[in-house]
Swiss-Prot record:
Belongs to the VPS10-related sortilin family. SORCS subfamily. Residues 1100-1159 are cytoplasmic. This is VPS10 domain-containing receptor SorCS2. Residues 1-36, 48-111 are annotated as: Disordered. One of its GO terms (molecular function) is neuropeptide receptor activity. It comes from the Eukaryota. Glycans are attached at residues 158, 328, 362, 600, 830, 891, 902. It is found in: Cell membrane; Cell projection; Cytoplasmic vesicle membrane; Early endosome membrane.
């Protein structure tokens, strides 16, 4: 949650006091390949061209960013450091610029007949262009040609001092490499380059101006090596500076809004420091602070002026809202106004309100506190289901919010609150939005400054964007009326309802369109912006329109977008074309845009980067910032309109105009308001003391002064009365509010409430029939029990904090029966009122049922939570036979330590499948229908503990298995761990390969779990040759292996000199041969030693009819839990198996798992 509000008068510290808030305006875009990007961040309510400052943000300086631009051909570099004064010549005199003069009104040269003006004697009651006499003074900042950024501060408030910081910012390195600080004490006529440390190169990163005493300035300086940082402090508008080393690196400074010497420093290490003597001494306040979410106390709301509101991260990683006084901000003195964690970057303190959001169990809730009372949920319509919420404005004891509801993508709905900021009603749907850099959101709505209650908004429906205006804070909206004639006096042929005027408000889809509407507090009713006529807003049309009666009538003034600046309360409007070519003239109007004149402000065309006037727009002096080429120095041109006006305005110089909406109704927001404006025939200065408001008269209340209350919506236009508010289907107006406590009273809503800040009296009162009712005793509803931190799995012996919440119902008379599932039972009162958690500790693993029953005489509710208490998993081993027969059933077994029956979930990935098999058992059975290598992966998850193991299996259609046994001495040394079994299998395989010359890759020895220690030897067949029907090499390999085993040639040593002998296990058969699934099974008979050759031939000839001692087995696909051989001749034949066999079934009941088992 962040502020994304429209422009309005500032109330808090300026941007030099703190970094731009989330609601700060976005950086302006360069119009159409314009190589210089103007970023205006003015320190006072200064009149710089560009976007208006945000609420709570003053504009102390202008930052200009220079990017490469092709220099115009034939331009000479200007001289630097000297003044160049130029007065306009007489009409008709030759202009200073070479080349043919363009036509009237064209930029780049003055229009014919207007190249210079001299002041003539004032004519009584008559204004004439002959009276205009402007003085332009140019100054070049010599030596700063390489600097690509500039920050400008005009102190204002009867001061003639201007400070300019130019710097070379290296984007790749992310820091400033060079800088220069210039100071003017004559309104910008001349500048002096300041030397902060004689003989030492000083790099200034930024400067900050105190909003309450703009004579006080702080410069932030750093070394190129980034090893140290210093501040330079001034209390005389930069005439002198005092160096102050600091032990941290400043990210931004935040001045106190009322006390000039108090300042906060947010560092690059996310630490917060405070100084009470303008930066001379610093004290650490807090660490792990969220940037841009630090706020000073609000005057008139916070009791302690030294209070600081902070969003900070605690040691557990959660973000908290905390407050403390700057003189004592230790951990013991921190106050947490909200007990739980909040979402990162959501804290906003603004005027009477504090906002944040908190997400738990995948549900986000938005909270508000009015005038520092307890936090309550913001009540939006029940099924708004907001995806995002942005604060638009908070002035006049009311909150405007933009809510992106569940179905919206690039639009928001606008809601208006009651004075407490709790209950919200819809005022406008589908306001256009845009997501900018760093995930910031801009809502296309603008508050018109100078006249309260007036807003402009761009609504997007079915892809079409149209501009709307309201005069009563969103109660009613209308389209802008188009002008009947264009700037050339031709008919526009634009008639409602098919055609209206549409304006770019705050941004545009085209990044080269500024999309700015210009309004000022000092010029009420004067609105100027870029847009077009038509059925919808066109992003690339930027015609300039102006109104002087607050949007009632509009006029077109230019065909292209211009930079706009208001001087002398709007008495002079200055415009410079927003273009990528160099300019030398400006346009100005002294009659609210009815007529325009041009002035040649420099003899050499310059690329204009921006305009700036003294804060408050109350003077007639302005500065144009620019440069002749990218490689040239910065050039500042001071334009002084004061010689054109000889006197101050008197009462006879003003006329009045009355505010009205588009229907002609003059009772707006419950009053008739009239304003003063200078007559077009008067040639005088309004001056600093001018006030525009003239008179106001309270009106009688009408139904239009009321809007729909929370839970109600206005009827559609098809119904008889469009002003009727009807209850939504989910809202029962007769039900007491959720926070209605026994003994209190509440007002049943009739569906209407008066528009906040509407001052009408008498007349219609649509709330007069409201009835005060006693809050009844209500049963508890929405009871919830959870573990603090949202975990439901804990470890034995760990402290668990149970939190009980109740959304509705009485809490004072309700009793709470708590059963924690392990024998602990208790009865509580005021459990949900205090919010104190219940601390408990489970000693034994298991699943515990936690229940809370809330009951009073009106009813009851119950909440249940199942808590898993388990030890973390230590080891996981996937036990599986490495060789599998085609289409044979095989067991995959996960050996887990420690065993957690009924608490562990196993995830099995077989082959390339992304979808796992889930089981609560530690083993599964499967089959493989294709030969090749198959990877099997298992994950065991128990609570927050997850382990994984993986194995590669070979799926073959032919292989032999020979059962093995070991001498009994081995059992005493068998720890029954997977690693030990693998090592024994490897040594047996290696010895057999060495003694028989059978390739080691064709032998696999698998030692079975448990005692006695047994093993199976897998003899793999090489790939068959295409021309070979049957090979006897397999028989020879088996005979060789049997021979070395019978000869007791395979043995290995254990510790202590114990030798272990490996032999064939007596199963009644020597070996089994497994064939492919589609052919017949053939097994070679072991030749009996000593038989005659003829006997051997006869036995081989009739081997299909005489079973002998060889087992002829076929592949069986039936499932066998223990996977023993399907063909057995005795009880001992269980060891002679086919592709799936008993060696896969793990048995660990005879020996405990060793502690060094790892996954």
């Amino acid at each position: 949650m962040a502020h994304r509000g429209p422009s309005r008068a500032s109330k808090g510290p300026g941007p030099t006091a703190r970094a731009p808030s989330p609601g700060a305006p976005p950086p302006p875009r360069s119009p159409r390949s314009r190589p210089l990007l103007l970023l205006l961040l003015l320190l006072g309510a200064c009149g710089a061209a560009g976007r208006s400052p945000e609420p709570g943000r003053l504009g102390p300086h202008a930052q200009l960013t220079r990017v490469p631009r092709s220099p115009p051909a034939g331009r000479a570099e200007p001289g630097g450091g000297e003044d160049r004064q130029a007065r306009g010549t007489e009409p008709g005199a030759p202009g200073p610029s070479p080349g043919p003069a363009p036509g009237p009104g064209e930029d780049g040269a003055p229009a014919a007949g207007y190249r210079r003006w001299e002041r003539a004697a004032p004519l009584a009651g008559v204004a004439s262009r002959a009276q205009v006499s402007l003085i332009s003074t140019s100054f070049v900042l010599k030596g700063d040609a390489t600097h690509n950024q500039a920050m400008v501060h005009w102190t204002g408030e009867n001061s003639s001092v201007i400070l300019i910081l130019t710097k070379y910012y290296h984007a790749d390195m992310g820091k400033v490499l060079e800088s220069s600080l210039w100071r003017s004490s004559d309104f910008g006529t001349s500048y002096t380059k300041l030397t902060l440390q004689p003989g030492v190169t000083t790099v200034i990163d930024n400067f900050y101006i105190c909003p309450t005493n703009k004579r006080k300035v702080i410069l932030v300086s750093s070394s190129l090596s980034d090893r140290d940082q210093s501040l330079f402090l001034s209390a005389d508008e930069g005439a002198t500076f005092q160096k102050q080393p600091i032990p941290f690196f400043v990210e931004t400074l935040i001045f106190h809004p009322k006390e000039e010497d108090k300042v906060l420093a947010y560092t690059k290490e996310s630490k917060l420091y405070v100084s009470s003597d303008l930066g001379k001494k610093w004290t650490l306040l807090q660490e792990r602070v969220t940037k841009d979410h630090v706020f000073w106390s609000v005057s008139g709301v916070d009791a302690d002026p030294d209070l600081v509101h902070v969003e900070a991260q605690d040691l557990g990683g959660d973000f908290r809202y905390v407050t403390c006084a700057i003189h004592n901000c230790s951990e013991k003195m921190l106050t947490a106004p909200f007990a739980g964690p909040i979402d990162h970057g959501s804290l906003t303190v603004q005027d009477d309100y504090i906002f944040f959001k908190a997400t738990s169990a995948n549900q986000t809730k938005y909270y508000v506190s009015y005038r520092r009372n307890e936090f309550v949920l913001m009540k939006l319509p029940k099924y708004a289901l907001p995806k995002d919420l942005q604060i638009i404005s908070t002035d006049e004891s009311q909150v405007f919010v933009a809510v992106q509801e569940w179905y919206q993508m690039d639009t928001y709905n606008l809601y208006q609150s009651d004075p407490r900021g709790v209950r919200y009603a819809l005022v406008l749907q589908d306001v256009r939005s845009s997501r900018q850099a760093e995930e910031s959101v801009l809502i296309d709505i603008l508050e018109v400054r100078g006249v309260k209650g007036v807003f402009l908004a761009n609504q997007k429906i079915d892809g079409k964007v149209m501009t709307l205006i309201t005069y009563n804070k969103g109660r009613d909206w209308d389209y802008l009326r188009p002008p009947s004639m264009d700037m050339n006096g031709k008919p526009t042929n634009c008639k409602p309802p098919d055609c209206h005027l549409h304006l770019h408000l705050r941004w545009a889809d085209n990044p080269y369109v500024s999309g700015t509407v210009h309004t000022k507090d000092t010029a009420p009713g004067l609105i100027m912006g870029a847009g077009n006529l038509g059925s919808q807003l066109v992003e690339y049309k930027e015609e300039m329109y102006i109104t002087s009666d607050c949007g009632h009538t509009w006029r077109q003034v230019f065909e292209e977008e211009h930079h706009i600046l208001y001087l002398d309360h709007g008495g002079v409007i200055v415009a410079i074309k927003d273009t990528s070519i160099p300019l030398k003239i400006l346009k100005f109007s002294v009659d609210e845009g009815l007529t325009w004149s041009t002035h040649n402000f420099t003899s050499t065309s310059v690329f204009v980067d921006g305009l700036l006037s003294e804060p408050g727009d109350e003077t007639l002096v302005m500065t144009v910032f620019g440069h002749i080429s990218f490689r040239s120095d910065w050039e500042l041109v001071k334009v002084d309109f004061r010689p054109s006006f000889s006197r101050q305005c008197g009462e006879e110089d003003y006329s009045s105009w009355e505010l009205s909406n588009l229907q002609g109704d003059r009772c707006i927001m419950g009053q008739q308001r009239s304003f003063r404006k200078r007559k077009s025939t008067s040639w005088c200065i309004k001056g600093r003391s001018f006030t525009s408001a003239l008179t106001s008269r309270v009106c009688e209340c009408r139904d239009s002064d009321f809007l729909c209350d929370y839970g109600f919506e206005r009827s559609s236009s098809s119904e008889s009365s469009t002003n009727k508010c009807s209850a939504n289907f989910w809202f029962n107006p007769l039900s007491p509010p959720d926070d209605c406590a026994l003994g209190q009273t509440y007002t049943s809503s009739l569906g209407y409430r008066k528009v906040v800040s509407n001052v009408c009296e008498g007349g219609v009162d649509m709330q007069q029939s409201q009835v005060q009712l006693q809050c009844p005793l209500t049963p508890p509803r929405g009871l919830q029990v959870s573990i603090q931190g949202e975990a439901v799995a804990v470890r034995p012996g760990e402290d668990v904090l149970f939190v009980v919440r109740q959304e509705q119902g009485d809490v004072l008379t309700t009793k709470y029966q708590v059963d924690l599932g392990d024998g602990f039972k208790a009865m509580y009162v005021n459990l949900t009122l205090t919010g104190e958690p219940i601390r408990h500790r489970y000693e034994s693993p298991g699943i515990y049922r936690v229940s809370v029953r809330a009951e009073n005489t009106a009813g009851h509710d119950e909440a249940v939570l199942f808590v898993q208490v388990n030890s973390p998993l230590q080891a996981l081993y996937l036990e599986v036979v490495p060789v599998i027969g085609l289409n044979q059933e095989v067991n995959l077994t996960a050996v887990l330590l420690p065993l957690n029956p009924n608490l562990t979930v196993f995830y099995w990935w077989i082959g390339h499948s992304l979808q796992p098999l889930l089981s609560l058992d530690n083993s599964v059975t499967t089959r493989f229908s294709d030969t090749g290598d198959v990877r099997v992966t298992v994950q065991a998850a128990c609570g927050n503990s997850v382990l994984q193991d993986s194995r590669v299996l070979r799926v073959l259609d032919q292989f032999q298995v020979m059962p093995l046994q070991f001498s009994k001495e081995l059992d005493a040394y068998n720890p029954n761990t997977p690693e030990w079994r693998e090592d024994v299998g490897l040594v047996v395989t290696r010895l057999l390969s060495k003694e028989t010359s059978v390739p080691q890759e064709l032998l696999v020895t698998v030692v079975k779990p448990g005692l006695p220690t047994l093993a199976d030897l897998y003899v793999l067949l090489p790939p068959p040759r295409p021309t070979r029907k049957r090979s006897l090499s397999s028989d020879k390999r088996l005979a060789a292996i049997q021979q070395v085993l019978n000869a007791q040639k395979i043995s290995f040593l254990l510790r202590g000199g114990v030798r272990v002998l490996v032999a064939l296990r007596d199963t009644g058969t020597g070996a089994e041969q497994l064939g492919g699934g589609g052919g017949y099974w053939a097994v070679v008979v072991l030749f009996v030693i000593g038989l005659f050759a003829a006997g051997a031939f006869i036995l081989y000839k009739f081997k299909r009819k005489r079973p002998g001692r060889t087992v002829y087995a076929q592949m069986h696909n039936e499932k066998e839990q223990e996977m023993t051989s399907p063909v057995s001749h005795s009880e001992d034949v269980q060891g002679a198996v086919q592709g799936n066999h008993s060696g896969v079934v793990l048995s660990i009941n005879s020996r405990e798992m060793h502690s060094y088992l790892v996954s």
